[in-house]
């Protein structure tokens, strides 16, 4: 028997769709239902590795965690990873299939809809309830032809829609009523009701607003959801949600915000540490001289981001930081930047065949067409502290400093490199700081006392609190009844 299905669409980006689906997934799972999250099309450079060796949006991985199941490539069958202002890498059912510019991508959509519906059918066959997340805004009617992310998917799959608005940014009445006004009648008929998210203050003061929206749209109000401040403890997928955590007196970890920063959830466990101040360095600002650690994050396009890094003068700041005895850690693309050169003989990242690196590690990288996607575990060196994380990268890095690897993987492969003085390190492994043992090790190197709290347990505690929050403010029985079976 196929599962019931319900789709949460939004009036815009960053209105809380991912968070609400995660909370609903945990709430319905606690009621004994087999829940699966699903997002037909996602656009993000913050990806997660699945057990199948594929990649999906990080939000769907969190939603899978909320549902108590392993992430699957079928939870996000189309993932777009932006490489420029107009083009993106296209990942289908976990595998990279090519790159496309925005106009070119429109022609791909009919073929991609078949993949989307295939993955959706697979999830329905193993679940009691599939919770679907839309993308961006439901009101982008200029993109409606061939749509696979919002109403196009809802209509093709027969999935009812609940529309989510965000009152915190202002204009929620206009955004919900305006969405109703621009939808064609068949699309509007898919909407079964609306939710208003991130309300602050006395809910009685917005009762007239909820009634007005219902009257103007013909959609019933399904809940007014108060602001949930604990959401800041959960990983953000969109770069709009990238957050620092500056604390006076804490050990300073400085992170340059690269144009195509990727997998920035590596920062979240550090943000959660009370003895650490995570400083996001925006373009136009220097790397802070007081930094204890400069962390070069992952990048979707290493060579263009390295060029941008130099344009900001951060290369000069970084070398001054090392001369002062400061530590540097490069993760994935950040690791590649730290070497002496990066070669791109296949033109994977553009037309530049080679670029000089920052020269802080005596290693060189060659970009290769094959992407490594896999969970990773092993020990760090020389202390033999265990770790769990994941690999998600193009390219191979070799050189004298790689003879001092930072990690040794369970299959015996060395990973990463360490400079002769031990101050500069690089690794291809993401997720190190989410491992409590590795986070404690690195905090010790910085002279900070770890909190001792389990990061993973903290995620589950926050998901439970989110589910409790939705139980109080949304009629979940009614939502379940609205889902199509």
From Swiss-Prot:
Keywords: Cobalamin biosynthesis, Glutamine amidotransferase
SUPFAM superfamilies xref list: Class I glutamine amidotransferase-like, P-loop containing nucleoside triphosphate hydrolases
Annotated pathway: Cofactor biosynthesis; adenosylcobalamin biosynthesis
Residue ranges occupied by any GATase cobBQ-type domain in the UniProt entry: 250-438
One annotated GO biological process: cobalamin biosynthetic process
Record GO terms (molecular function): ABC-type vitamin B12 transporter activity; catalytic activity
Matching InterPro entries: Class_I_gatase-like, CobQ/CobB/MinD/ParA_Nub-bd_dom, CobQ_GATase1, CobQ_synth, GATase_3, P-loop_NTPase
One Pfam family it belongs to: CbiA
Active site: 332 (nucleophile), 430
Top-level taxon in the UniProt lineage: Bacteria
Similarity comment: family membership: Belongs to the CobB/CobQ family. CobQ subfamily.
Function of the molecule: Catalyzes amidations at positions B, D, E, and G on adenosylcobyrinic A,C-diamide. NH(2) groups are provided by glutamine, and one molecule of ATP is hydrogenolyzed for each amidation.
Protein name: Cobyric acid synthase
Organism for this UniProt entry: Methylobacterium sp. (strain 4-46)
């Amino acid at each position: 028997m196929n599962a019931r299905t319900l789709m949460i669409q939004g009036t815009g980006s960053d209105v809380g769709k991912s968070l609400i689906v995660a909370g609903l997934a945990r709430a319905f799972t606690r009621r004994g239902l087999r829940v699966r999250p699903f997002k037909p099309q996602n656009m993000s450079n913050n990806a997660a590795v699945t057990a199948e060796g594929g990649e999906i949006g990080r939000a769907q991985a969190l939603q899978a965690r909320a549902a108590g199941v392993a992430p699957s490539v079928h939870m996000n069958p189309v993932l777009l990873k932006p490489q420029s202002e107009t083009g993106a890498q296209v990942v289908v059912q976990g595998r990279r299939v090519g790159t496309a510019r925005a106009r070119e991508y429109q022609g791909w959509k009919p073929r991609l809809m078949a993949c989307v519906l295939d993955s959706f059918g697979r999830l329905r066959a193993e679940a009691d309830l599939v919770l679907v997340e839309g993308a961006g805004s439901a009101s982008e009617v200029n993109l409606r032809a061939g749509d696979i992310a919002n109403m196009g998917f809802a209509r093709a799959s027969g999935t009812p829609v609940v529309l989510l608005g965000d009152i915190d940014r202002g204009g929620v009445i206009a955004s919900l009523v305006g969405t109703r006004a621009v939808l064609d009648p068949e699309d509007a008929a898919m909407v079964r009701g609306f939710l208003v998210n991130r309300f602050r203050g006395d809910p009685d003061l917005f009762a007239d607003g909820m009634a007005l929206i219902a009257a103007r749209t013909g959609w019933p109000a399904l809940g007014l959801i108060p602001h949930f401040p604990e959401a800041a403890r959960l990983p953000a997928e969109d770069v709009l949600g990238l957050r620092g955590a500056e604390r006076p007196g804490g050990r300073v970890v400085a992170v340059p915000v690269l144009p195509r920063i990727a997998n920035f959830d590596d920062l979240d466990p550090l943000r959660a540490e009370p003895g650490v101040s995570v400083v996001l360095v925006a373009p136009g600002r220097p790397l802070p001289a007081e930094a204890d650690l400069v962390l070069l994050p992952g990048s979707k396009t290493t060579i263009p981001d390295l060029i941008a890094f130099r344009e900001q003068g951060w290369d000069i700041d970084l070398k001054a930081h090392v001369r002062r005895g400061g530590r540097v850690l490069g993760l994935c693309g950040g690791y590649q930047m730290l070497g002496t050169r990066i070669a791109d003989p296949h033109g994977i990242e553009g037309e530049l065949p080679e670029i000089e690196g920052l020269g802080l590690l005596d290693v060189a990288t060659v970009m290769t067409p094959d992407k490594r996607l896999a969970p990773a575990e092993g020990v760090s060196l020389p202390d033999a502290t265990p770790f769990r994380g994941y690999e998600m990268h193009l390219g191979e890095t070799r050189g004298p400093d790689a003879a001092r690897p930072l990690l040794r993987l369970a299959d015996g492969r060395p990973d990463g490199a360490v400079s002769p003085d031990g101050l500069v390190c690089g690794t291809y492994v993401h997720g190190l700081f989410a491992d409590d043992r590795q986070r404690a090790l690195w905090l010790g190197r910085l002279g900070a006392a770890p909190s001792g709290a389990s990061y993973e347990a903290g995620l589950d505690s926050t998901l439970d609190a989110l589910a409790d929050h939705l139980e109080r403010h949304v009629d979940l029985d009614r939502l379940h009844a609205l889902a199509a079976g």
